[in-house]
């Protein structure tokens, strides 16, 4: 097992980590998995809201700060974008309606809600396949 692989008994979410450690989320002090700086409380809550998983390194939990998440998103998008498709193609490739397809924002990593997916449809914007996962833009990161 590598240093980044979690043991099966290690919590995967911040909420689970808080339960296991019996501490409130606002008391968590975790390093960023990328820059190693302590992730601030607002970023801890944003990490949980974005439904991201805890990264385990050498037995210690890590989260990610907003700046590193955005930078990591941009790097992945630029280096690993496989293709860009309109919603019809995404539905066809996945074999299910857009509402049932899990899509994250490629910039901030938040899961897109149905309103955000519909915005791509309404504005004829493409979804992007990055490392085998479909990505789009959330309302916060949307740029016309």
Swiss-Prot record:
Keyword line: Activator, DNA-binding, Early protein, Host cytoplasm, Host nucleus, Host-virus interaction, Inhibition of host innate immune response by virus, Metal-binding, Modulation of host cell apoptosis by virus, Transcription, Transcription regulation, Viral immunoevasion, Zinc, Zinc-finger
Record-linked InterPro entries: E6, E6_sf
Domain of life: Viruses
The keyword Lyase is assigned to this record: no
Assigned GO CC terms: host cell cytoplasm; host cell nucleus
Gene3D superfamilies hit by this protein: E6 early regulatory protein
Any GO MF annotation of the entry: DNA binding
Zinc finger (unnamed): 32-68, 105-141
Biological process annotations from GO: DNA-templated transcription; regulation of DNA-templated transcription; symbiont-mediated perturbation of host apoptosis; symbiont-mediated perturbation of host ubiquitin-like protein modification; symbiont-mediated suppression of host innate immune response; symbiont-mediated suppression of host type I interferon-mediated signaling pathway
Localization annotation: Host cytoplasm; Host nucleus
Keyword Glycoprotein on entry: no
Oligomer and partners: Forms homodimers. Interacts with ubiquitin-protein ligase UBE3A/E6-AP; this interaction stimulates UBE3A ubiquitin activity. Interacts with host TP53 and EP300; this interaction inhibits TP53 activity.
Function: Plays a major role in the induction and maintenance of cellular transformation. E6 associates with host UBE3A/E6-AP ubiquitin-protein ligase and modulates its activity. Sequesters tumor suppressor TP53 in the host cytoplasm and modulates its activity by interacting with host EP300 that results in the reduction of TP53 acetylation and activation. In turn, apoptosis induced by DNA damage is inhibited. E6 also protects host keratinocytes from apoptosis by mediating the degradation of host BAK1. May also inhibit host immune response.
Additional remark text: Belongs to the low risk human alphapapillomavirus family. The cancer-causing human papillomavirus E6 protein has a unique carboxy terminal PDZ domain containing substrate but low risk E6s do not possess this domain.
Family affiliation: Belongs to the papillomaviridae E6 protein family.
Entry protein name: Protein E6
Species name: Human papillomavirus type 54
Gene (name only): E6
């Amino acid at each position: 097992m590598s240093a980044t692989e979690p043991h099966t008994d290690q919590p995967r979410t911040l909420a689970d980590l808080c339960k296991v450690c019996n501490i409130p989320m606002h008391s968590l002090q975790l390093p960023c998995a990328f820059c190693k700086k302590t992730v601030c409380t607002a970023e801890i809550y944003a990490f949980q809201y974005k439904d991201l998983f805890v990264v385990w390194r050498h037995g210690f939990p890590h989260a990610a700060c907003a700046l590193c998440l955005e930078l990591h998103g941009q790097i992945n998008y630029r280096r690993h974008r496989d293709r860009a498709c309109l919603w019809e193609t995404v539905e066809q490739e996945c074999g299910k309606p857009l509402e049932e397809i899990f899509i994250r924002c490629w910039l901030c990593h938040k899961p897109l809600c149905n309103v955000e997916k519909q915005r791509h449809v309404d504005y004829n914007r493409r979804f992007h396949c990055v490392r085998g996962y479909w990505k789009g833009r959330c309302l916060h990161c949307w740029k016309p």
